[in-house]
Amino acid sequence: MSERPSRRGLFPAWLVSAFSLSANGQDWTALREQMVRLQIERRGVRNAAVLRAMREVERHLFVPESLRRSAYEDHPLPIGHGQTISQPYIVAAMTEMLDPKPADRVLEIGTGSGYQAAVLAKLVRHVYTIEVVEPLGRQAQALLERLGFRNVTVRIGDGYEGWPEEAPFDKIMLTAAPPEVPQKLIDQLKPGGRLVAPVGTGWQELVVIDKDLNGRIRRRTEFPVMFVPMVPGKR
């Protein structure tokens, strides 16, 4: 579900125009509230901080203008390059599973539109996020900067390698599905940390991996999901 469909010149036209919607701001606020109540709380997400972040982050700014009216609907949306922004419930559920804390440093694999990073940034000290598709990564970086998210750092690169120079991380989230969780990412998880990821090919399972203080790994499966594959390299 987490497919990943300006400074002028850096921002595409749909993104620039998004910031002229203040006249409809109350409408967007009402739509976010409805999204949280009907799609997220009703499905069992209870973490108050996560719900607050979902209410605060302006999801419609992370989608193309032609799809903005659908931004708060209960499904993923294309954002270009064969990628999508995840369904709101999946964003909230994975964030709650991650159990983010205010002092956490979080690694995200799969920046996409930047929406998941923005939600995490409301909850933790710093988000390090890696995107393999360079145009998407640059676009997300510019938008996050424009929106004032100073605690998000974007890198264009191979998510399979992680971010070793900033490791270890308190939490790691994958928003694309590898066949199996890369050992390099498990190695970059701090003892006492948690990793949440879709795993498998085709239909996948959402997996939670906990590393205890002695470095032992415990793994549990939550529910079936469908994400884009996690591809190596840089595109």
Where are these regions (language model features)?
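Class I SAM-dependent transferase core
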Residues: N24-L107, A118, L123, R138, ...
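Conserved nucleotide-cofactor-binding alpha/beta core module
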Residues: D99-R218
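N-terminal secretory signal peptides and thylakoid transit peptides that target proteins
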Residues: S2-W14
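Short amphipathic alpha-helical segments with coiled-coil-like heptad repeat character
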Residues: M1-E3, F62-P64, G193-R194
